[in-house]
Amino acid sequence: MKRVVLLIVVAGVLLLCVVAVLRKGAPRPVTAQPPVMPAPPAAVTNAPAVSNAPPISYVPPLAATPVEKLPKGWEDFRKLREIGQLNRVTAAMENRTLPADLLAFFEKEIFNRQHWDVTRNNMANALVWQESPNPRLHELFAKMLADETESPVWRDYCLQFLSECMKSSSDPEAIKSLLARYAQGKDGLAGTAIVNIGLQEGAGRIKPDETFSQQLEAQLTDPEVVIPTKLSILGMIGKRHDVRLLPLVRSYATHTNDSLRRTAMATLGLIGTRDDLPLLQPGLTNRNRAVQMAAKGAMARIEAR
């Protein structure tokens, strides 16, 4: 009986040991961790801006560049090279009834100094040669003529076109005044103005008084007047048959400048007398062929009268 009880006790002790071993190797339960709370946000304050920070200014959006509206059939004009633009304008120049939009374009584009002078010249021709030109076209040429930043060549062109406008102008008196004013100068423009006064006189649109002849005399004796203008004056004296100035013309028939000399000889051929033949004779053997021809032609005209 004692042996049985002892075995039961031993068995119980062994069972407890096994249970203890099993519990020691078993996984431990995961204990719940407290949640991690985010840090509270920093308080927002109305702190002033840093003093050296650049101010933020409003920049409006860029306005769209307006698209230039060119005349019908001329949409590619800006893309052409200058020679192409010249050819396009020259072709239009021959049309005496150009559409209004193209004429308006020429009246603005003629101020564009990026064009060759010949291109601008042909635009002017197109405007002036119309069957019914703008009666105020002279104002356009007067404006460019007065602009001293324009080239001398282009201002000379403008003076000629200004004169050309007289026959269709709404204000021919304004053109007469401008021609008269520029004719009194000492530069090349004066010569151009004088020639055009003569042309308009021949057309019956201008009738210069005696003071014009006196002006020509004063300019021809003025050493500061440029040679091209004196050439124009000598030619004008012959064209107007201004025999009052014949003695002055004779003085130029022996001038050392060949251009002045031959022009004076040509004028003597128009208004000179047989008394001028001895004056012209030396010109026949002059070294300059042009002077020889002028002397020969003048003598032939005088002898034919």
Can you describe what each PLM-predicted range is?
Residues L7-A20:
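Hydrophobic membrane-insertion alpha-helices, especially the h-region
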Residues R81, Q114-W116, T149-S151, G185-D187, ...:
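Short inter-helical turns and helix N-cap capping residues of alpha-solenoid HEAT/ARM repeat scaffolds
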Residues Y58-A63, R78-T97, D117-P133, V153-S169, ...:
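Structural detector for internal amphipathic alpha-helices that build alpha-solenoid repeat scaffolds
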Residues K24, P29, P34, A53, ...:
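Positively charged, low-complexity intrinsically disordered regions
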Residues G25-E68:
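Juxtamembrane proline-rich low-complexity "stalk" or linker regions positioned immediately after a signal peptide
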Residues L16-V18, A124, A253:
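Sec-dependent N-terminal signal peptides of Gram-negative exported proteins
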Residues P60-E75, T97-F111, S132-A146, S168-A183, ...:
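Amphipathic alpha-helical scaffolding segments comprising HEAT/armadillo-like alpha-solenoid repeats
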Residues M1-V4:
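Positively charged n-region of N-terminal signal peptides that target proteins for export
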